A protein has these predicted regions:
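Acidic/His/Gly-enriched intrinsically disordered linker/tail segments
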Residues: 132-157, 180-311
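Short, flexible segments with low predicted structural confidence
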Residues: 52-53, 162-163, 238, 255
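N-terminal low-structure segments adjacent to metalloprotease catalytic domains
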Residues: 1-74, 290-311
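Juxtacatalytic substrate-recognition/specificity segment
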Residues: 44, 51, 58, 63-183, ...
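Short, charge-rich amphipathic segments
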Residues: 23-43, 60, 100-104, 122-125, ...
Length: 311
């Protein structure tokens, strides 16, 4: 049964070495009718980077800067969740969105928690979001939904728009900790894939979402770059040059891999060979088993044009 949800420092040296030398198990992602996935990608027990005492001290300092007494603070490892909705609602987001996403992402992709204790600020509406982002962080949000700020060690969300952006942004600090050299296309491709997600066979699963129509228009107009070009984009190129198409192409490449049982396998292959394959392009060719990537792009475009939003 498919369960859908709209969910728009010290470490002992030996343990550190074990994590740094770790290579992910290259088993494939599981979908109905495809190969099963191992219960966990990690070959060793995850290391607890921060202690209960670390979280307690963090929360004590955090409470000193709360904008008002109307905020609830919940420790949800590896994050601390802060929200100005009723306490039971904040706890619900913490358990059913944050914990769920963390558990599922770690199940298939990530062995390590983020490098720092990060705060997730869940503001109840656009007024609270804009006001408190300015008051707490000295900046006006560039998006009405939410964003991750590594500078402020925080995910800053307008939770009234739904939990999809929250799950998207949770991906980024995990990428930072586990795959620092990850190129923008995969970082944002994975993040945006899970903007609308649920579970299939107990694993996180992305569904077609609002990015689809724009990508389909770009395909029909012949404006989608080659996969070699997409994967080679640096941050400036990805975020500043035709940003919408880049996000859409990255998301639906990840979606295609997911639907063919190849996404987790690709991630682990790329992770294991990142020094020799900095863009992931060669790993992509290997996992697809395709030499002619121009022919694959045409096949992929036909596939994307058959998709419908919300299916």
């Amino acid at each position: 049964m498919i369960k859908r949800r709209q969910i728009l420092l010290l470490i002992p040296l030996a343990a550190w070495l074990a994590v740094s030398l770790f290579r992910l198990n290259p088993s494939a992602n599981a979908l109905s009718g495809s190969a099963s996935v191992d219960a966990t990608p990690a070959a060793l027990t995850p290391v607890e980077t921060f202690t209960d005492a670390d979280f307690t001290r963090h929360v004590e300092q955090l409470k000193k800067k709360l904008p008002s007494a109307g905020f609830t603070v919940v420790i949800q490892r590896p994050f601390v969740v802060i929200g100005d909705e009723p306490a039971d609602v904040v706890k619900g987001h913490s358990e059913h969105t944050v914990k769920w996403a963390v558990d599922k992402l770690k199940q298939d992709f990530f062995a390590k928690d983020p490098n720092e204790i990060l705060d997730i600020w869940l503001f109840k509406d656009s007024v609270s979001y804009e006001k408190n982002a300015q008051a707490l962080f000295g900046e006006r949000p560039a998006t009405p939904y939410g964003y991750y700020s590594s500078t402020h060690r925080a995910l800053i969300m307008n939770i009234s728009t739904g939990g999809g952006t929250l799950v998207h942004e949770i991906v980024h600090p995990f990428i930072e900790a586990n795959f620092p050299a990850c190129p923008p296309w995969l970082n944002e491709g994975l993040g945006s894939l899970y903007e609308q997600s649920g579970e299939v066979a107990g694993h996180i699963h992305g569904y077609p979402n609002w990015r689809l129509p724009g990508l389909q228009r770009a395909i029909k107009a012949g404006n989608v770059p080659s996969f070699k070009t997409l994967t080679a984009l640096d941050a400036s190129g990805f975020y500043n040059e035709d940003k919408g198409t880049n996000y859409g192409q990255a998301r639906y490449l990840c979606y295609y891999l997911q639907q063919h049982g190849l996404l987790v396998k690709f991630y682990r292959e790329f992770y294991a060979h990142q020094k020799a394959d900095r863009t992931g392009y060669q790993s992509l060719r290997k996992i697809l088993g395709i030499a002619d990537m121009n022919a694959f792009k045409k096949q992929w475009e036909k596939y994307v044009l058959t998709l419908t939003q919300g299916s």
